[in-house]
Design a protein with these regions (language model features):
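Hydrophobic h-region of N-terminal signal peptides that target proteins for export
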Residues: 8-17
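Exposed low-complexity, polar/acidic, P/S/T/G-rich flexible segments that act as propeptides
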Residues: 568-583
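Sec-dependent signal peptide recognition
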Residues: 1-7
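Formylglycine-dependent sulfatase
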Residues: 2, 18-387, 394-415, 419-422, ...
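Hydrophobic residues on conserved beta-strands that form the core of alpha/beta folds
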Residues: 24, 61, 548, 559, ...
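Extracellular ligand-binding interfaces
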Residues: 484-558, 566-569
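Extracellular carbohydrate-recognition regions
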Residues: 440-472, 477
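Short carbohydrate-recognition loop motifs
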Residues: 471-489
Length: 583
């Protein structure tokens, strides 16, 4: 046989093999509460007809879980198929060194011949570097500011760089995804569509909010509007698949990244300029919220559809995890995976009824000061030294702690959880003590104690020893959030009563929506005020990614007072560490 015929047959064989692989789409929502799917029938005001249709065409998981009650770690687990604590990605402020060494499901599928594309929120490093994690195409719009992209709204190639926002971010991601489906309809593709909804800021256009008239909290109306945009986006994606004859060739996952942040009080604070607070979504009937390993924190909307392969109209009763996405995708794409590389399981044989046992013997979590295990209907939850045991078959709302009635069950689950946590990096049931916010959450949701008073406006008390000037500083989960006063400038945070022998090393990890110059200023013992010379500047870029700055304070005496300045705008701080420099 002539050499060129051999090559041709090889190419045709590879093309046929690739064409037989299913398309895979993962749709990920942001701070989306368990209740907010119309098909659940929990809340009467939510309207999600396209998501309801997706659920009816496939499976709604009664017990679907994310890997963490917070954005960054849950996304790290989803993308790698490995519990994120194995590579030291425990919270929003964690360094990404471990994640950057992991192989994502996008890389695995790209190596198997898939065209891969990412849309929306990334939150796992600089958006311009998303292609390094296996995505050929990037359209990372998650707000109304400029965003990195290497494709247009129409799915055409462009050089990677900032692109102006021309449409609402949820609409833009859906339209770009539909364009990529049209472009690659003849070959397998993997799409990761991560809508930044209904996460704050609650920026739904009026046209979406108008679908929800009547009396309700404005934050609720805005969240429902954002979810309506998500629902329309899902409708556009599924209709594009149908138009191109791809519905039965496409496996779709729809999952929330964690529960809704209620902030206990569900305060209907003004939307303008507020990128925190209650996002308007609800976790009913689950107890707890984002920032907890209670059910309300990580028991999430979870749908799977693959018409013609997975029987539709199912409600699947056994627990499943977002970790299962990578394992399922790899199996369906024919990707070989080394034993132990993935923590999830291939769900398809379970959803087809070929295997009737539960996919998991147990599911386990560790997040900051909390850890939990679910085995069957038993769930053990730990927060610091507190421990709770629930029978979720009769108490999904986690209202009745059975630890004292069933000490043998609690001990058995604790032993399993302890052994599993010893495998993580770093090991241990907890990474530190419970913060005041988490203690308030546990007191209110799990102990039934009265809710703490809502924060006064403005908050002038010290937060972890820090105060804001010309702004408001509050603690949300493990992060300090700084909101400048309206119309004012010169906002900074400050801490006094220090006793740090110089020189001093300052390490701050932050993110901000503003670009410009930041600085650390210091006052030494004996100085009556901050001297102009005692100021160390650094550059700041607007980004939703965490930025780290290490600043040397060349003090010769004792530093007693510091200030941290960033460009004017809202900012978040995960780390503010000042200590004597090593000598």
């Amino acid at each position: 046989m002539k050499p060129f015929l051999i090559v041709l047959f090889c190419i045709l064989g590879e093309f046929t093999q690739a064409a037989d692989k299913p398309n895979i789409i993962v749709i990920y929502t942001d701070d989306h509460g368990f209740a907010d799917l119309g098909i659940r029938g929990v809340e009467k005001d939510v309207k999600t007809p396209h998501l309801d249709a997706l659920a009816r065409s496939g499976v709604i998981a009664r017990h679907g879980y994310s890997t963490a009650p917070q954005c960054v770690p849950s996304r790290g687990g989803l993308m790698t198929g490995k519990f994120q604590g194995r590579f030291n990605l425990d919270n929003n402020g964690s360094a990404l060194d471990g994640f950057n060494k992991e192989t994502t499901i996008a890389t695995r599928l790209q190596n198997a011949g898939y065209t891969t594309a990412q849309f929306g929120k990334w939150h796992l490093g600089p958006q311009s570097e998303i292609p390094k994690h296996g995505f050929k195409h990037v359209y990372s719009q998650h707000g109304q500011q400029k965003f990195p992209a290497n494709i247009t709204l129409e799915g055409k190639d462009r050089p990677m760089g900032d692109m102006p926002s021309k449409v609402y971010h949820v609409d833009g991601c859906a339209k770009a995804a539909a364009s990529i489906i049209e472009r690659y309809k003849e070959q397998p593709f993997f799409l990761y569509i991560a809508f930044r909804a209904p996460h704050t800021p609650l920026d739904a256009p009026q046209s979406y909010k108008e679908r929800f008239p009547g009396e309700m909290p404005e934050r609720r109306r805005a969240a429902l509007g954002m979810l309506a945009a998500v629902d329309d986006g899902v409708g556009l994606v599924t209709s594009t698949l149908k138009k191109n004859g791809l519905s039965e060739k496409t496996l779709i996952f729809f999952i929330g990244d964690n529960g809704a942040p209620l902030k206990i009080h569900k305060t209907d604070s003004p939307l303008e300029g507020d990128a925190g607070g209650w996002d308007g979504s609800l976790n009913t009937p689950l107890n707890g919220e984002k920032g907890m390993l209670a059910e309300g924190g990580m028991h999430v909307p979870f749908l799977i559809a693959w018409p013609g392969t997975i029987p539709g109209g199912q409600t699947y009763e056994h627990p499943m995890s977002a970790l299962d996405v990578a394992a399922t995708a790899a199996a369906m794409a024919g990707v070989s995976v080394k034993p132990g590389d993935l923590d999830g399981v291939n769900l398809v044989p379970y959803l087809k009824g070929e295997i009737t046992t539960p996919p998991h013997e147990a599911l386990m979590w560790r997040w900051m000061a909390q850890s939990a295990i679910r085995e069957g209907n038993w769930k053990l939850l730990r927060g610091g030294e507190r421990e709770y045991l629930y029978d979720l078959a009769t108490d999904l709302e986690e209202k009745h702690n059975l630890a004292s009635q069933h000490p043998d069950v609690a001990a058995r689950l604790r032993t399993k959880l302890t052994a599993w946590c010893a495998e993580l990096n770093p090991p241990g049931l907890a990474l530190g003590p419970m913060s005041p916010v988490w203690n308030d959450y546990f007191d209110f949701y799990l102990e039934g104690k009265p809710a703490p008073k809502p924060e006064a406006e403005p908050n002038t008390s010290a937060t972890r020893g820090w105060l804001a000037r010309k702004g408001r500083l509050i603690e949300k989960e493990d992060v300090l959030v700084l909101t400048p006063d309206k119309g004012g400038k010169g906002t900074f945070i400050t801490r006094s009563q220090l006793k740090l022998p110089g020189p001093v090393t300052a390490k701050i990890i932050f993110k901000t929506a503003a670009t410009g110059q930041g600085a650390i200023a210091w006052r030494m013992d004996g100085d009556k005020d901050f001297l102009p010379a005692n100021r160390a500047p650094f550059e700041v870029k607007a980004s939703e990614d965490w930025q780290t700055r290490e600043v040397q304070i060349p003090a010769t005496g004792r530093v007693i007072h510091v200030r941290v300045h960033l460009p004017h705008g809202q900012a978040e701080f995960s780390t503010l560490d000042f200590k004597p420099a090593s000598r």
